[in-house]
Amino acid sequence: MANLHTPDGEIKKVFPINEDTFSLQELQSFVDGYIEKIVLPVDKCSMIINEEGKKEKLPYNKFATQILLKNYPKSEDYIVGNAIICANSDLA
C-alpha cells in the first residue's frame, strides 16, 4: 500500500495490482509519466514523482514538497504533480 498525494491536497491509498509490489507501469500511471525515485532517509521510505513534471509545468505539490524538505532541509527543490509515498519494499 502507498499514499498518492495530489497537488490539490487529496491523499488516496493505492495498492499494487499483484498485492505485492508496484510495477513500473503502475507507478508511471500514478504520476502520469516517467518516474523519479527520491529516497526519504528520515521517513525510511521513498517518494515517486514525475521525472519531467517541472518541464511539463505540472502544478506545485505543497504536501510532497514539505515531506522532501523534512528529509533534505537544505534542499531548494520542490515537487510538482502527483507524488507517491511508499515503503521501499513496495517497489519492484
Residue ranges: model-predicted function:
Residues 1-92:
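Domain-length accessory/inserted modules outside core catalytic folds
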